[in-house]
């Protein structure tokens, strides 16, 4: 019996020795920092003392990785600070403060280890990776900034006038328990400065203003702008362009032109034909005028200069124009003098429905006309003549108007001297 027991014990020892050589034993859980086993190890393994031993290299690497995770998240990146890194709630909540005041309190507080003042107190230092995890990635209840992106945070700094002074990159080396192998951690620091953002001058924060970014207009709006400007031309602009640079399709009758003369050109375009208009000019007399005046009423130097206009691209027809006058002064053979509607103007009317071209309809005391502003070369007219007005004593069988509705006077109301010349 004793031989059997000794034989079984020898086999168990042989199995244990084989398992240790091949690394098949169970991996122990990393000891707690305050446990008695960690503070006073009873039987330290030779693998901890000799990092170059070939007893269990896989076990040593696995232990280092497991122990590095909590240290890298909490202790390795952070500097010592008081307990409780949660900003106070209520009136002192950092989320409700403006950006400069909020940032100044973050830098001046000891609750955060990812941002601090430099030695001079004129710049603030940001540990980029730790700042993104410690402040930007906080939960909603403890949120400090509305954004969660480090790029958006740096964009806010630029809008408030912060300037990057320099950038520093260094490595932090840590040890895992009692192992002699060092682990390096890359840290990236950003230095930002502002003349109004000082450690000892918080009253200057009110001078910091956020700039508004200027956005360029969309390209399609810029392309549509010339088209809209070309299609929305005013009638006056169109007429001015016709005088200065006529179109190729326009047929122009050549006439003698002077720099300051009143002569104009006859145009034929898309507008309907209009009745020729006569505007008297006391300074210029033309022998080619188609309409002459009786010698008893007008002098030789006051003959009217006729300016025919075939196309009038002007505004719509104005209200009816009333021609005042006395029945004794109005006849069907001579012109009738009336007051002009506006200075520097040309009167034109539609010829549709007229008895003959150049004649006004009979038995009509109101005449619809169109007022078109003339160019600067045309002199101002003092009187307007309407040729071939019918006498009011003619009775129209289809009209109920008689001459008794006209006020009896010796001449036109606006020209009292004309009555003396006609008597």
From Swiss-Prot:
Q: Tell me the compartments it is located in.
A: Nucleus; Cytoplasm
On the tree of life, the source organism's domain of life is Eukaryota
Residue spans of biased composition, Polar residues class: 243-254
Expressing tissues: Testis-specific.
Family annotation (SUPFAM superfamilies): Winged helix' DNA-binding domain
Q: Where is this cross-link: Glycyl lysine isopeptide (Lys-Gly) (interchain with G-Cter in SUMO1)?
A: 215
Q: Which GO terms describe its molecular function?
A: DNA-binding transcription factor activity, RNA polymerase II-specific; sequence-specific DNA binding
Span-the-membrane segments of this chain are: none
User: Is-annotated flag, keyword Transcription?
Assistant: yes
Q: Keywords for this entry?
A: Cytoplasm, DNA-binding, Isopeptide bond, Nucleus, Transcription, Transcription regulation, Ubl conjugation
The residues that make up the annotated DNA-binding region are 98-282
Q: Where is this region: Disordered?
A: 1-56, 215-303, 397-423
Ranges of Basic and acidic residues composition bias in the record: 1-25
What Gene Ontology terms describe where this protein resides (cellular component)?
chromatin; cytoplasm; nucleus
Can the keyword Cytoplasm be found in this entry's annotation? yes
PANTHER family referenced in this protein's UniProt entry, alphabetically: HEAT SHOCK TRANSCRIPTION FACTOR, HEAT SHOCK TRANSCRIPTION FACTOR, X-LINKED
Question: Which family does the entry's similarity section mention?
Answer: Belongs to the HSF family.
What's this protein's name?
Answer: Heat shock transcription factor, X-linked
| Species whose genome carries this gene | Homo sapiens (Human)
Gene it is expressed from? HSFX1
